[in-house]
Amino acid sequence: FAITYQVGGVVLKKEILMVHNAPQVLIRYTLEDAHSATLLRLNPLLAFRDIHSLSKQNPVANTQVEVVDGGVRTKLYPEFPYLYMQLSKPANFGGAAYWNNNIYYTKEKERGYDFQEDLLSVGAFEVSLKKGESIVFSASLEEANPKNLAKDFTKFLKERADRNSFEECLQYTASQFIIHKAGETRIKAGYHWYDS
């Protein structure tokens, strides 16, 4: 999945990849065009919740981060695992924690579910990019090796099956309903917003 943003003379491409059978999302940002070096600011917004509820601003969320190789890790609530947020090249991380309130989910409202959520920012990454340069952001429940993130993104992208025919689309989609979790293999009997 890719989105290209264009503001003035700056063109930034964002590619999002969920890693198959791993609790990790990789996002590659490429500065496709710019008149000069550009400062990219990444401000992750965190929920730390299950799929059936939405986050609301509260005083018990832990806003502290711990430095890890290439980024930080955080755990908003004791019952959740750590979230590792890392980059493929050195970046500055800082800023005060704050709540971004009343995020509006149109599809959830259409389905008749709660549709407004408060998301916590524990800080932001800042990194300078030159024209043609890329950086990969990883969010994972496991610590990654930042030196491998760019290579891993390219490898995982190449592993994606071609979907040029109906049969290829069906095979690819069917594989998404096979879940390997905690040493068990399950077949998802519905959409992912239902409990597995």
Regions found by a protein language model. Give the residues of each.
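Acidic, mature catalytic/reactive cores of soluble proteins
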Residues: 1-196
